[in-house]
Amino acid sequence: MAIDTSLPKDIRILQAAEEVFSQHGYEKATLDEIIALADVGKGTVYKYFGNKEHLFYKLVADKNAPFLEKLRSAVDSVNSFEDKLKKYFEVMVHFYVANSTLWQIICFEMLGGNNGCRVKLDGDNFKVIPRYNSVKVSEETSERILRYHKILHDEYDILSQLITKAMQNNLLKHDTVPEITTKFVFFGVVMSIFNQSDDIAADMTDEEAARIITDHFLRGNAR
């Protein structure tokens, strides 16, 4: 991939970072390769982004913000619960297919699984806790994990609000637990996209995928 050297340096660095992170994942990606592809000096990267982790976060945060706006606009553009679900999943599927590798890095490398950590709701906030007694979570690690957790939480919280309102309006079973239901559906879709076969990716439109997801969520697989 060639980077247009007429672009501003920070844009070139972000474009190069997306290419390198997508090829190698987070841990194996190097700033040296990003610097070479962007055709900038090492000091320029540190000037704009500080370090590799801050660069990666800037890359995904800049993608996440317009994605959230599209999700909100999509669900607000229709009236019925079923149509809102379809619109939500249309936007979600399109984004996750287009950004699959970067969001796999968030899920599998940045959320603490490799460090023996997980995120738990604590009152109105989230906190990082160790999965095992021998694991010690540093403040720096905790802050990093929570940054990436917020990206995903903001995405599925829009779905959670839809499900909560539908339950309150007697459109879903009264024993529905919004948090469990939301994560079950959201991360089920996410993992399906991360692991989809090539023929499904090539043949299925965002609209068709959203229709199937919504239909299975509301009606199941029973005939």
Spell out what each predicted region is.
Residues G116-N169, E179-K183:
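Amphipathic alpha-helical packing segments from all-alpha helical-bundle domains
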Residues H94, D157-N169, K183-R223:
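C-terminal peripheral helix-coil segments that are non-catalytic and often amphipathic
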Residues F56, V60, N64, L85, ...:
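Amphipathic, non-transmembrane alpha-helical scaffold segments
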Residues Q104-I106, H174-D175:
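Short, hydrophobic secondary-structure boundary micro-motifs
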Residues K58, S73-T101, T182-V185:
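Hydrophobic alpha-helical connector segments
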Residues M1-H24, K28-V40, H54:
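Basic, helix-initiating cap at the start of DNA-binding domains
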Residues F21, Y26, T30-L31, G41-K42, ...:
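Amphipathic alpha-helical segments enriched in hydrophobic/aromatic and basic residues
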